């Protein structure tokens, strides 16, 4: 078989629309819990009928994750921007644990040496779940093994468990924390010192009052007291703060204090290992622990009344969360990939625009550019603030889609853009709430906004690629529990090439996110650089 490329007329602008969390559920038995199926989507219906479309892979080995693991927005945008399969950090860390190199990593052993010298305590902080979007529970198990290997016993290892419920079942936390405590008991080392939901500990939108609750819990023991982690979780399940905050994500500050004991908190001379490997939801709590008093005083958003920085605290992070953070990094980022989409387009002297709302802004900029903090030449970034007047987006499923659309239309009208990357967060962020009716409204809002961008782009002589980074809102009922499904899916996602030249011509099947950048370049009339292993989806198999 030979792959023959169908040459495209150069288009300007070429617009890549990422409908975040909009997947294709292949099983009709879930139609009544499929927001994409239930929504009124005249734009998507029209595009699918008139232009070539295909399903592409967004999970597992197709995006550099373990087989069967769902994709996520960070991984998805990095793969899209790279034009190649990107080996993800979860794989690097897991390999290091399996080959034992993790246990001799100098940053890891440095934490052990620090507490032995100071007489302090080792703390394990992280999202305790098997979602493998932000963390992997098995990496936490490895830290317990690390403590045992180095002679720590009992509460010389304190675990601060952040519960998930967003990338996992809303009530899976009890199982995950039980796995931790069982391993601690079998190993003779480790106790759970605190439990709190990711809604608080993993904020990324400068809602510092949430981070304050987590920080005060871990440093002062501030929160409701329970005799065990399981008791804390079960209590919240029975008494959520409100109906829209049901499940692990929203568990309030819980200090675990056995009868006759006292809270175990982070103190001077201690060491903290933060096991999360994804950076966007770790930065705020990390800065609270590590910024000196002067830096904390000037922190964006105002921070909170933290008090003085904890003295002599060894703080290590599984990966590099942000350039310049005053932490020890266990696994440094690999060298930057050359000739990613943004860099390659910039090298041609072309203008590009990236746009998303706050929730997905890092994804179309930082992650899309392989963890680069600054734009390339002729690369412009635009952000629409995500709504701050609601605590969960089911209360405002339209989010900031209209604001994003206006910014993109302005760029198209200006005539200066060669490439535009836009993310609509609604399908993913509202899908995470598990509220079907709201997810339907989210899909409908995105569909309407996409229609406006499509019309303006075609009128300007451009073309579009309409797709997603992963699925979510096409599965709103959990197949195992029958309750709300709040996590991503492993389903494929649609990709539509909206270009008059390709009407009636099939797209190549079996594609993945790595093929999107080459597809965009082909529409722009540019050669695909050799570093990109993805191929344009306008290639077809011939005899």
Curated annotation (Swiss-Prot):
Belongs to the BPG-independent phosphoglycerate mutase family. One of its GO terms (biological process) is carbohydrate metabolic process. The active site is at residue 73. One of its GO terms (cellular component) is cytosol. This is 2,3-bisphosphoglycerate-independent phosphoglycerate mutase. Binds 2 manganese ions per subunit. Its cofactor is Mn(2+). Monomer. Catalyzes the interconversion of 2-phosphoglycerate and 3-phosphoglycerate. The keyword Membrane does not apply. Pathway: Carbohydrate degradation; glycolysis; pyruvate from D-glyceraldehyde 3-phosphate: step 3/5. It catalyses: (2R)-2-phosphoglycerate = (2R)-3-phosphoglycerate. The keyword rRNA-binding does not apply.
